[in-house]
Amino acid sequence: MMTGVDDTATMLTGRVVTPERVLDDGAVLVEGDRISWVGRRADLDDRSAERPDDWAEGRTILPGLVDVHCHGGAGGEFGADPDAGRTAAMHHLRHGTTSLVGSLVSAPAPSLVAGVAACAELVAAGVLAGIHLEGPFLSVARCGAQDPTTLVDPDPSLVDALLTAAHGGLVQMTFAPERSGAAELVDQLATARAIPAVGHTDCDAVVARSALDRVLERGPRAGRPLVTHVFNGMPPLHHRSPGPVAAALGSAARGEAVLEVVGDSEHLAPETVRMLFETVGPDGLALITDAMAASGMPEGRFRLGGREVVVEGRTARLADGGAIAGGVATLIDVVRWCVTEVGVPLHDAVNAASRTPAAVMGWADVGALEPGRRADLLVVDDGYEPVRVLRAGAWVT
């Protein structure tokens, strides 16, 4: 039984999603900026049981969500304009993403360095949890919405400039392992504690597995490789030419790689997402949004890294060519779709949107409703719509 509750503590009761289970009649105690207790409401002492915040009763309490791949939202894009980045980050925070990595697409070197420097300001201010570079060392054949004219082989001097501009904030970088110099890039990034993530690649299974093994050996952050939005930006799985998907699935099934999954109803079919949860499991999957500036905005025309994007319904596509150009969802939208449309158990979907991405980044302070962790949580209604968001013990909404 829990005892000794501070009179200034916040107590929430409802359905609570912990790392291990869903407590149908649970409680979360927040003291200051920390979670101090999580458990069954029946285990509260008499004094504490009389003090819950009644508005949360009957609702579901989730850990603050963790999105490690997001390009923007609310009309703002992560890049050289820090104000636009703040706008995007606040949009996702209000929808329950309490730890957000800002992603930048490929661009000419000066623009990329400037964008990283601006995002580093947001990391220093606590607005972003880190920076992700999706390029420019990618495959032209699998560039997706990336500008193919900006894609180049790994350049150690450019990487040094980007790392310098990031001031320690670079947490992952997507690369195509078939590019000349890719092995050296893995070593350079790992030394800087940035995770090399395999993606936007046209390589075969052998090359992909070798790259994932090299990242595993170098062990940046928590020691696990990442695969950028698995299935998207790479050859499809074929029984005689398995490609990087086979290597990614095998590595994740062994408990090694973590696979990013854009579960937004547009990037992957429901059966594909269900297969990933059933074969790999939530410990090897990180649900992401891959959201761009159009997230939270009406249909219309937007830009992604300088390229024009047309948004109709839930789909963002390049105006020129029609390639999918990121997503328009928030991470709670992704969780909702996985649970209500795909049939993923709530516990698994939430872990893949919080605990697993936090773990792969080595962030022991966030990602779960556990005593001692930062008090980040999201309260949702029966339709998994956000009701209130708490970050570091302070209500955001």
Task: Annotate each PLM feature.
Residues 74-76, 108-109, 140, 146-149, ...:
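Short, small-residue-enriched loops and turns at beta-alpha junctions
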Residues 1-47, 394:
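N-terminal metal-binding scaffold of metallo-dependent hydrolase/deaminase domains
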Residues 14, 28, 33, 58, ...:
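Divalent metal-coordination and catalytic microenvironments
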